[in-house]
């Protein structure tokens, strides 16, 4: 049996068009939810109680149908159904790799984009954790030369609802809400939550969609709802320097930097945002990241490109650049994609690079590709519909997911 023969592919029922026309309560803050209920005639003295009820049903119980809210009066449920939705996005396709990696192709309404848009989310299970990679934009404004996503133009930002919906849907499909059963024969953590960690490493630059990302992550880490630990949430940025401090101050999650080069001339080519925010400014922003300590290190992502950035001189430059910054360095074997001019570094060279960094006192794990058989590894993600149309690229760095964030 071939690798591809072992993949399970399903296409669940599409989301109804009626639900697309109503505003979703998902992604609203408590204040916004209260204002929405007030506008529909809910008595002022009931607002706080109703918001608390809805918050619990949506984020603790994980319901996607108002009729399942059994402690909410029937007339209230009818009003909610008439004016709002808590439906999940349409699942166009679900794929399950033989290593347990899952990839969902999700479809959202146009919202100014001219047509419905699609994004992909990836779940990677390990023995002690399950990590979900989430997107913040449809497409990307950055044009990183080694990244497949850079070949797709930015279509639009995702809303807080759409960012959170990726997490809610994944927990639905994995049986990760109370009184839900996990799919049979599924590889996932033996104990605890199925989705224990999330990483903002999907399509797009999250710090170019700061407000929606902030709202979604504050809800995801709310102790009375989804209750994810901030130490288990990692936001990855290519280096939008002005928003880095705000991320630590206002969101308080773990930070990852897509570094990939230690010289400005090379990083200008690989990660063009470096022309606007060069390495000196980026590293200084990292040094002042709120909450930074040896227990809350910044992860620096470094894709290994043959004869480009993989020499021992580059390794020495990396150690010098990060001196004094509590850091972990993720070395990522490059996944070639059609049309790229880059190659992955030889494995022997990657190991030499890693050994040098380790000898300097930095943790430098080499990320093992996951989900390659369903094109879910770094630089490989692209929807089936996009492959057929070949007009846009849906790709993002998912191979770096494993082991991001703290363990406690």
UniProtKB/Swiss-Prot annotation:
Its EC number is 2.1.1.192. It is an enzyme of class 2 (transferase). Keywords: 4Fe-4S, Cytoplasm, Disulfide bond, Iron, Iron-sulfur, Metal-binding, Methyltransferase, rRNA processing, S-adenosyl-L-methionine, Transferase, tRNA processing. Residues 126-375 form the Radical SAM core domain. It is found in: Cytoplasm. Binds 1 [4Fe-4S] cluster. The cluster is coordinated with 3 cysteines and an exchangeable S-adenosyl-L-methionine. GO terms for cellular component: cytoplasm. The keyword Cell cycle does not apply. CDD domains: Radical_SAM. Disulfide bonds join 133-378. It catalyses: adenosine(2503) in 23S rRNA + 2 reduced [2Fe-2S]-[ferredoxin] + 2 S-adenosyl-L-methionine = 2-methyladenosine(2503) in 23S rRNA + 5'-deoxyadenosine + L-methionine + 2 oxidized [2Fe-2S]-[ferredoxin] + S-adenosyl-L-homocysteine; adenosine(37) in tRNA + 2 reduced [2Fe-2S]-[ferredoxin] + 2 S-adenosyl-L-methionine = 2-methyladenosine(37) in tRNA + 5'-deoxyadenosine + L-methionine + 2 oxidized [2Fe-2S]-[ferredoxin] + S-adenosyl-L-homocysteine. [4Fe-4S] cluster binds at residues 140, 144, 147. The active site is at 120 (proton acceptor), 378 (s-methylcysteine intermediate). S-adenosyl-L-methionine binds at residues 204-205, 236, 258-260, 335. SUPFAM superfamilies: Radical SAM enzymes (SSF102114). One of its GO terms (biological process) is rRNA base methylation. One of its GO terms (molecular function) is metal ion binding. The keyword Disulfide bond applies. InterPro entries: Aldolase_TIM, Methyltransferase_A, RlmN_N, RNA_MTrfase_RlmN, rRNA_lsu_MTrfase_RlmN/Cfr, rSAM. Its cofactor is [4Fe-4S] cluster. PANTHER family: 23S RRNA METHYLTRANSFERASE, RADICAL SAM CORE DOMAIN-CONTAINING PROTEIN. NCBIfam families: rRNA_mod_RlmN (TIGR00048). Belongs to the radical SAM superfamily. RlmN family. Specifically methylates position 2 of adenine 2503 in 23S rRNA and position 2 of adenine 37 in tRNAs. m2A2503 modification seems to play a crucial role in the proofreading step occurring at the peptidyl transferase center and thus would serve to optimize ribosomal fidelity. This is Dual-specificity RNA methyltransferase RlmN. It comes from Rhizobium johnstonii (strain DSM 114642 / LMG 32736 / 3841). The gene is rlmN.
């Amino acid at each position: 049996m071939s690798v591809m023969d072992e993949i399970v592919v399903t296409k669940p029922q599409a989301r109804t068009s009626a639900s697309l026309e109503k505003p979703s309560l998902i992604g609203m803050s408590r204040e916004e939810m209260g204002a929405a209920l007030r506008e529909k005639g809910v008595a002022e003295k009931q607002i706080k109680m109703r918001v608390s009820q809805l918050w619990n049903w949506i984020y603790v119980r994980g319901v996607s149908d108002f009729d399942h809210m059994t402690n909410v009066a029937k007339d209230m449920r009818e009003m909610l159904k008439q004016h709002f939705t808590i439906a999940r996005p349409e699942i166009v396709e679900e794929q399950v790799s033989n290593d347990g990696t899952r990839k969902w192709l999700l479809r959202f309404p146009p919202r100014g984009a001219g047509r419905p848009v699609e994004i992909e989310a990836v779940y990677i299970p390990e023995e002690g954790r399950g990590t979900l990679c989430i997107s913040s934009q449809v497409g990307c404004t950055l044009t990183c030369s080694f990244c497949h996503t850079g070949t797709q133009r930015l279509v639009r930002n995702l809303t807080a609802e759409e960012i959170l919906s990726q997490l809610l849907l994944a927990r639905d499909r994995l049986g990760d809400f109370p009184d839900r059963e996990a799919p049979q024969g599924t590889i996932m953590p033996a104990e605890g939550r199925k989705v224990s960690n999330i990483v903002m490493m999907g399509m797009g630059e999250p710090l170019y969609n700061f407000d929606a990302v902030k709202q979604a992550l504050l809800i995801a880490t709310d102790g009375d709802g989804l209750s994810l630990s901030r130490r288990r949430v990692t936001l990855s940025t290519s280096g939008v320097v002005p928003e880095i401090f705000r991320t630590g101050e206002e969101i308080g999650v773990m930070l990852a930097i897509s570094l990939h080069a230690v010289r400005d001339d090379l990083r200008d080519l690989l990660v063009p945002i470096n022309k606007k925010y060069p390495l000196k400014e980026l590293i200084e922003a990292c040094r002042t990241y709120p909450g930074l300590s040896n227990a809350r290190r910044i992860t620096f992502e470094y894709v290994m490109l043959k004869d480009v950035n993989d020499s021992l001189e580059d390794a020495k430059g990396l150690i010098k650049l990060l001196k004094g910054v509590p850091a972990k360095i993720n070395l990522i074997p490059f996944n070639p994609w059609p049309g790229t001019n880059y190659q992955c570094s030889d494995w022997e060279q990657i190991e030499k690079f890693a050994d040098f960094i380790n000898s300097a006192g930095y943790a430098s794990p080499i990320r093992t590709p996951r989900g390659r058989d369903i094109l879910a590894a770094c630089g490989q993600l692209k929807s089936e519909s996009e492959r057929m149309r070949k007009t846009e690229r849906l790709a993002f760095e998912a191979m770096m997911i494993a082991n991001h964030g703290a363990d406690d």
